[in-house]
């Protein structure tokens, strides 16, 4: 989150086992807690956190740039989708949690038709 997505660590608690991170939009968006040998997330459909989404810009060029940076850092892009209202890349963080890196599409689409948020997902090619 810090090295590849630009989050800044703003502090630690629990004797250094938890770090608060911010993208600069608010006091913190993430609180990551080290839990030792805890099992990873369950596979497939499950209860709990599905994924987090992080907006990286406002254009497909910015999403392409993010994809290139992530791939150059050795991150595997597991999928890419066009959601009509946004375009997204999907990857896993080091703990196996799914992270969606996205840019918003034309806001007039969902403002004119709020149901566009649940439009069928289309493939995205970058």
Predicted regions and their residues:
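Core segments of cupin and vicinal oxygen chelate
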Residues: 1-34
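Short glycine/proline-enriched turns and hinge-like loops at secondary-structure junctions
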Residues: 14, 44-46
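Acetyl-CoA-dependent GNAT
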Residues: 33-37, 104
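Short beta-strand/turn micro-motifs at beta-sheet edges
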Residues: 37-43
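Short, solvent-exposed beta-strand edge segments and adjacent coil->beta transition regions
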Residues: 47-51
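Vicinal oxygen chelate
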Residues: 52-98, 103-108, 121-126
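An amphipathic, aromatic/His-enriched active-site/gating alpha helix that lines ligand/cofactor pockets
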Residues: 111-112
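A short alpha/beta connector and helix-capping loop motif
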Residues: 117-118
């Amino acid at each position: 989150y810090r090295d590849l997505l630009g989050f800044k660590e703003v502090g630690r608690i629990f004797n250094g086992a938890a770090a608060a991170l911010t993208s600069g939009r608010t006091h913190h968006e993430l609180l990551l807690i080290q839990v030792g040998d805890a099992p990873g997330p369950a596979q497939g459909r499950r209860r709990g956190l599905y994924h987090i989404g992080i907006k990286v810009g406002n254009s497909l060029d910015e999403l392409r740039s993010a994809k290139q940076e992530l791939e150059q850092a050795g991150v595997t892009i597991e999928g890419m989708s066009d959601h009509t209202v946004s375009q997204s890349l999907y990857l896993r963080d080091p703990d196996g949690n799914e992270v969606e890196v996205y840019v918003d599409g034309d806001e007039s689409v969902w403002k004119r038709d709020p149901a566009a948020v649940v439009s069928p997902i289309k493939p995205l090619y970058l």
